[in-house]
Amino acid sequence: ILDEESTLHNCDNPEDKVNDGSIQFDNVSFSYIDDKEKECLKNINLNIPSGSTLGIIGGTGSGKSSLVQLIPRLYDVTEGSVKIGGVDVRDIDIYTLRNEVAMVLQKNVLFSGTIKENLRWGNKEATDEEIIHACELAQADPFVQTFPKKYNTYIEQGGTNVSGGQKQRLCIARALLKKPKILILDDSTSAVDTKTDALIRKAFKDEIPDTTKIIIAQRISSVQ
C-alpha cells in the first residue's frame, strides 16, 4: 500500500478558488472497479443551488455515501462530471476543493488531546469565541459546559470518554470551524436524540444560510 500512488492529481493550471457552493451532477456514473456492470451510481443528474439544503434517505448500499464522496473528489467519476460553482471538480486544486467541502461521517474520529485541540483540527487559527460558537450551533456547548475543565477537558484517543452523540456533535462543530461552502453530514447525527437533531438543523438554517448543506440520514425527521 505504501508504494501505491494516488490516481487523483491536479490538472495543469487548476482553479485556486471555489466560486460558490452550488453543485451540479451531469449524467454521473461511478464504479469502484473498472466494470460498468457493477456501477453503484448510474446516470445521475442533480442540481443543488448554493445555500440550499438537500436531504438524502436510502437503504444500506444504495449509493448515498458514494454520491457525496464525489463532491470533494475522494474519487473521480467513471462517466459524466461533478461541478462546484460551475467548475468541474477535476479542474479545481484538490487542496482548495477539500478546504471548501466539510464532511462529517457517522463514525468520525477524535484524537487524544483537549476539546479545543480537537476542534482546531478544523481550523488551527480558530479563536476561543469561534470554537464556542461552533459548539453552540452543533449543540455541543451545553454538555461541554458540564465538564469541570470545560473546553480544556482531555479527550482520550478515539473519544472513548465521551458518548457517541457527544462525539458526533464535536465532530460537527469541528467541520463548522472550517467555514466551508459545502457541509455534508453522512448519517452523522445517528447517535443524537431527535430533539437535539432538530436544534442542530434549526441552527444551520438560522446561522449558516449561505452554506450548502447535504444531510444523509436514516431517520426521516433528520432531513425535514
For each of these PLM feature ranges, what is it?
Residues 3, 7, 11, 16-224:
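ABC-type nucleotide-binding domain
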